[in-house]
Amino acid sequence: MKKILMLLLIAGFSRAQSLLTLDEALQLVRQNNLQLQKQQQKQKIAELETAIKRGQRLPALDFSATASYADEIAKLDIPIEKLGLSLPPNFTAPSIELGGHERTDFALGLRQPIFTGGKLRSQVELAQTAVEAEETRLTLLQQQAAYQTYWLFYQAQSLKKERKIQEASLMRLEVQLQQARSLFRAAQVMAYDTLQVFNQTLQVKMQLEQNQRDQRLIDLQMARLLNLATTRPIAEIDLVPPAGVRAVLDSLKQQALQHRPELSGIRLGQRSAQLSRKLAQATYWPDLGAEAKYHYGKPGLNQVTNEWMDYSTIGVNLQWNLWRANQDRRRVEAAEVELNRLTLEERELLRNIDYDVEKGWENAAFAVKQIQLAERLRAQQQERYRIVSTQQREGVATTNDVIIAEGDLTQAELQWQRALIQYYLAQSEILLAIGKIAE
């Protein structure tokens, strides 16, 4: 039993520590992200509201029960004198009691709207538009979450690559430190040279500590974004330099116009404004409804007998507001103003989309050029470091020359790696700008 428990614990630990790939992170963010889950609940609420609005167009069945007690009873006096009759002495005029003190009524009613001027239909369409707007909002949040996942993943790649470069730099410096100490013991260099190399080594170690801290923070941010119980180390991948082929800018802009969820949201807002105006105009018309009821009560229609009886009623109800201080007209005007505002917002959004696509495209082009230049610089710095190291062994170059060459080589390698990361981030920006990053 203990062995089984140990195996389960080891298996759970290995799963928790398994490397997180980009594809898995994108899948987890769609499944687990709390913002997306909250938006899904909002979408369900909108769907339920649509079902409620549709139900208002159907017949409604109501049941009611009433029981009351009256301390007075209506009486109907019989006019004896008018009938030509006379009452004996000491007799009061006869009367008929209508009903009794206790009144009870059970009713089952059916109500059906007949004409509302299009109010109910507009309300259903407005609710359905709200559902589509929530779906569009969910798509937008999915794209934003996917972009955050891309950004964190590539930031993690940058830190991992930088750490390797810093570790290689540290190894070179440690070799130089050993050589400097050997030369110092042989009285060929001063203590200053050894101290200079040692200080540079400490600088790189501090950078490695900061890199480790930054990687831990990236893991924490990724776990929060993916709603994971524990952090998982992000897998390291090989970043391939870009090829020479680039996407056509006009094609990217056309894709953005087709797929950006913000545009769909604006157009759904315009449709909602049109429906709101239509709904406000519908209040100019009367509401007509039919109603039928089945009653069982005491007293019934025959108040004189005061007995239990059943009966039915059927009728129509007309309600027409004739004056409301221009409230309906102002609602129509408000809907028209909202429609005009959304039209302007659409124009602004189109400009912003155009800018987003061009910005991502320019950033990608700039990153490609930076990669090419950084690659040449890295090769030159590698050759320079090799030459200076050889010259130092021959006694031509100083320790300071080697440290400067090593630092320049490290910076060139970091520049090349950062340019490569910037290219991949620019590609993510393009995917976000054209609305296809979550696909």
Give each language-model segment a name:
Residues 48, 138-255, 360-363, 367, ...:
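Periplasmic alpha-helical coiled-coil/stalk elements that build and connect Gram-negative outer-membrane
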Residues 16-66, 72, 114, 188, ...:
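Bacterial Sec-pathway N-terminal export signals of envelope proteins
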Residues 37-41, 54-55, 98-100, 114-142, ...:
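Sec/SRP-type N-terminal targeting helices
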Residues 3-12:
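Sec-dependent N-terminal signal peptides
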Residues 64-109, 237-246, 278, 291-324:
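Small/polar, glycine/serine/threonine/aspartate-rich low-complexity segments that form flexible
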Residues 41, 174, 203-228, 378-436:
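Short segments within alpha-helical structural elements
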